[in-house]
């Protein structure tokens, strides 16, 4: 899957680009990735390295998620990908979120496909 153009960044006078998505304000040189490992400078622009790629898909009861009183009794279509700008030692997905191995992201689906499959399975949320 091709790398997807990213939003929320701007060019700097020194040839780098700055990510404006989170408070880390990563300033990247060509080929460099941000702290999240998801956003990269390529060809003078910001691209997403994991767009449309996932470490897996699953339908879960909403109660399994850290969402209090959100559609009680419903199902959620869950998926995950590598990349996170945090470094929480207690994170249950630390090995995935901090993975630098893009081969772990073996499943692929566009946002439209994810929404379609979630609706087909009666999931009220993604």
State the predicted function of each range.
Residues 1-74:
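Flexible, acidic/Gly-rich N-terminal and inter-domain linker regions that tether
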Residues 41-126:
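Conserved Radical SAM active-site core
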């Amino acid at each position: 899957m091709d790398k997807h153009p990213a939003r929320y960044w701007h060019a700097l006078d020194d040839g780098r680009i700055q990510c404006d998505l989170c408070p880390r304000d990563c300033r990247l040189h060509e080929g460099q990735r941000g702290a999240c490992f998801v956003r990269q400078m390529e060809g003078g622009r910001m691209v997403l390295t994991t767009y449309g790629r996932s470490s897996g898909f699953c339908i879960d009861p909403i109660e399994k998620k850290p969402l209090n009183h959100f559609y009680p009794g419903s199902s959620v279509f869950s998926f995950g990908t590598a990349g996170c700008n945090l470094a929480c030692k207690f994170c249950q997905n630390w090995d995935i979120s901090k993975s630098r191995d893009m081969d772990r992201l073996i499943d692929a689906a566009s946002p439209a496909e994810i929404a379609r499959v979630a609706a087909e399975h009666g999931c009220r949320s993604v």
